Amino acid sequence: MDHIRNFSIIAHIDHGKSTLADRIIQICGGLSDREMESQVLDSMDLERERGITIKAQTAALTYKARDGQVYNLNMIDTPGHVDFSYEVSRSLSACEGALLVVDASQGVEAQTVANCYTAIELGVDVIPVLNKIDLPAANPENAIAEIEDVIGIDATDATRCSAKTGLGVEDVLEALVAKVPPPKGDPEAPLQALIIDSWFDNYVGVVMLVRIVNGTLRPKDKIRMMATGAQYPVEHIGVFTPKSKNLESLSAGQVGFIIAGIKELAAAKVGDTVTLVNRPAAEPLPGFKEVKPQVFAGLYPVEANQYDALRDSLEKLKLNDASLMYEPEVSQALGFGFRCGFLGLLHMEIVQERLEREFDMDLITTAPTVVYEVLQRDGTTIMVENPAKMPEPSKIEEVREPIVTVNLYMPQDYVGSVITLCTQKRGTQINMQYHGRQVQLTYEIPMGEVVLDFFDRLKSISRGYASMDYEFKEYRAADVVKVDMLINGDKVDALSVIVHRSQSQYRGREVASKMRELIPRQMYDVAIQATIGANIIARENIKALRKNVLAKCYGGDISRKKKLLEKQKAGKKRMKQVGSVEIPQEAFLAILRVEDK
């Protein structure tokens, strides 16, 4: 066991984490040169294309150190994005050490810091590594100062390397072997294994990636999940060297996979503890929590007959993504669809993209909403994730909205515009620190404001230099109202939004005027109204198309003309009673885009 090292790599997006992983695999001979391709561990096309890591992956490698000893290195690749922070904390808790990769030309960024703090809280040893030192813009001294300043770990002897050219990667491995402690654990104790990740394979069912903390596991053992209590016989166990390789046993300190013929992913929850049925552990490993979706949106097929196909696609995605929630919902305007829950905005985009790309779906997405806590007059509290479920204003005692703590990092030139943005979004400033040229701002902002377009606007006002991460803090009472859109007195449910009262008038006017442009003129007048409860806050009229009924009258008596006009008016009135206004699909899409502005 003294020769096992479990480590993961922490880095901000694009700081070269996956490339470094590739080099390490190559040096340790995990794959032949022929099988080597860039970003070996990012197995999803979308991961490669966006250059982000979504699922955790592992590789068990052997490394012959300079002192002649052979070490078993278990590398656990972690996602870097804030939406997947729970997966990160699980990956990190399976390690004893973490390589903190910092781009020598860019310095420390927000998500690096967020994940690094998670690592330090879990008691993982952090080893700083400066990557991309082959770039002409690299400034290692500056980066070292930032690491010490912002994160507060000693970085004077940080290893310098360039993952692209392979320079200095062996020094990184030497530092790993020297500084990361070997795993603690007792191979004889009752089995405790932490599920780091799980995914669905078409041939063998659910594959669980585990770190054995105590005990030993062999094929044919019966295992039990401690969170759900489900039991399964083990079929295969082994390790990934990125390719899978079956073994006869996995014992304390090792990281490997278990295949046990599990049919659905919900049974193998990330962070759960696996133990043996006939010799169970006394208690599960700490830190398990159910992941709750934070952002909700409605997904509707453009063609109504694709509803079943959409349901199948969501089921298939759910096999590989336990944090995706969905339930069917019906909208009068958009027909049948699903209300889906996501961890955050990136997660939502990825799910949408995978549906469109891997399953060929055409989707309409309603504006994302967050979960509000509503205290009703009768004393009950309900959680509202869909504007349509919001009770009438007369029944509401108070509404509480989720508040998130946002950490922002940016060069000091952009501080002014970022502060303005945060204030527009009803943020309150908590803290502001200068670290050399970088500034760290901490704000508390309502989550509903963050999910709409905060990230895009932050990037555009800071020319892409600002980075952010956020975490949920608490529910807080707020003056939020539901704005409904009426067309000729009928509610259009898909366009209801929940906004802060201060923005409700502007929002109502904006949507009403947009609808006026987009709804084609009818044979009768159409009134578009925005309402809060029974109060109308904005109105637009679309005038009727009308025939010139006086054309055949040439001169003649005024009473004759009046009679014809009255007759036309009565006809229009009758039409208005029976007619219903069809809203074209383009109008919906355009209105949902207004909300992104």
From Swiss-Prot:
UniProt: GTP binding residues: D14, H15, G16, K17, S18, T19, N131, K132, I133, D134
Q: What would you give as a GO molecular function for this chain, any one? A: guanosine tetraphosphate binding
Kindly list the GO CC terms recorded for this protein.
plasma membrane
Q: What is this protein called?
A: Elongation factor 4
Topology relative to the membrane, per the entry? Answer: Peripheral membrane protein
What gene codes for this chain? lepA
UniProt organism field: Paraburkholderia xenovorans (strain LB400)
Q: What is its main location?
A: membrane
Swiss-Prot/TrEMBL GO biological process terms = positive regulation of translation
**NCBIfam families given in the database record:** lepA (TIGR01393), small_GTP (TIGR00231)
User: What family, per the record?
Assistant: Belongs to the TRAFAC class translation factor GTPase superfamily. Classic translation factor GTPase family. LepA subfamily.
CDD domains, per the entry? EF4_II, EF4_III, LepA, lepA_C
State the reactions this protein catalyses.
GTP + H2O = GDP + phosphate + H(+)
Give the EC number(s) listed in the UniProt record: 3.6.5.n1
Domain tr-type G span(s) in chain numbering: 2-184
Q: Where in the cell is it found?
A: Cell inner membrane
What is the stated purpose of this protein?
Answer: Required for accurate and efficient protein synthesis under certain stress conditions. May act as a fidelity factor of the translation reaction, by catalyzing a one-codon backward translocation of tRNAs on improperly translocated ribosomes. Back-translocation proceeds from a post-translocation (POST) complex to a pre-translocation (PRE) complex, thus giving elongation factor G a second chance to translocate the tRNAs correctly. Binds to ribosomes in a GTP-dependent manner.
Which UniProt key words apply to this protein? Cell inner membrane, Cell membrane, GTP-binding, Hydrolase, Membrane, Nucleotide-binding, Protein biosynthesis
